Swiss-Prot record:
HAMAP family: PanB (MF_00156). The gene is panB. Pathway: Cofactor biosynthesis; (R)-pantothenate biosynthesis; (R)-pantoate from 3-methyl-2-oxobutanoate: step 1/2. Keywords: Cytoplasm, Magnesium, Metal-binding, Pantothenate biosynthesis, Transferase. It catalyses: 3-methyl-2-oxobutanoate + (6R)-5,10-methylene-5,6,7,8-tetrahydrofolate + H2O = 2-dehydropantoate + (6S)-5,6,7,8-tetrahydrofolate. This is 3-methyl-2-oxobutanoate hydroxymethyltransferase.
Amino acid sequence: MSTAKKDYKRITTKSLIEMKSNGEKISMLTAYDYTMAKIVDTAGVDVILVGDSASNVMAGHETTLPITLDQMIYHASSVVRAVERGLVVVDLPFGSYQSDPKEALRSAIRIMKESGAHAVKLEGGKEIKESIKKILNAGIPVMGHLGLTPQSIYKFGTYSVRAKEEQEAEKLIEDAQMLEKVGCFGVVLEKIPADLAKKVADSISIPVIGIGAGGAVDGQVLVIHDMLGMNNEFSPRFLRRYLNLYEEMTKAIGQYAADVKSSDFPNASEQY
């Protein structure tokens, strides 16, 4: 297996499969607006996920369930306008694909047409197989999502690690293989044991991107607000914080407010 890194001017679904076959890890982060997406893309992140986690970090909801298709399209279109290199993947939100394959296709088409995104992501396995096939048959690239699927939080009752038991682990492997067979270009595995994630990654040729799934998969994804330390209340075991922006931003904004109160801002050099 080659470890030579290819310089991709534009990441495509084909690029990601090549990266896996060449042993090159895939980086993936969320973004929900133009400015953040521009920074993420300029930094060289391969895949930019417009996640339904916007429901949490942008709108303040406790779960991902409330965000609507219209809201996802708004966020996605903002991101797409900023991105020049990365592959933009958009979550189909809860309620936009679960009822039947035709609804799933309509939702996916709206995202692609109205935002200009490059692919969609759906949560689930065999239970949404027909919806995935319907979307793929329309020429829309699909990424799967298995393990802890946040849209099913009320079914699980907890955000704890999934697929610890043999039966659930076997189903997860079968679902991952099904996703590859029907034509998905990749799959996200969330919060499952590292050894199981490795088995999945080794059993399929499409990239496996982990979040809380160990280091033996083909790439990693995090929510950007979490890895930049913009939320002090969320600190799962899998999260590595690269900055403490909550503290730094609070300090900077506090200093600005103090400077305004004291008439220190603006000074003579900051006026026309």
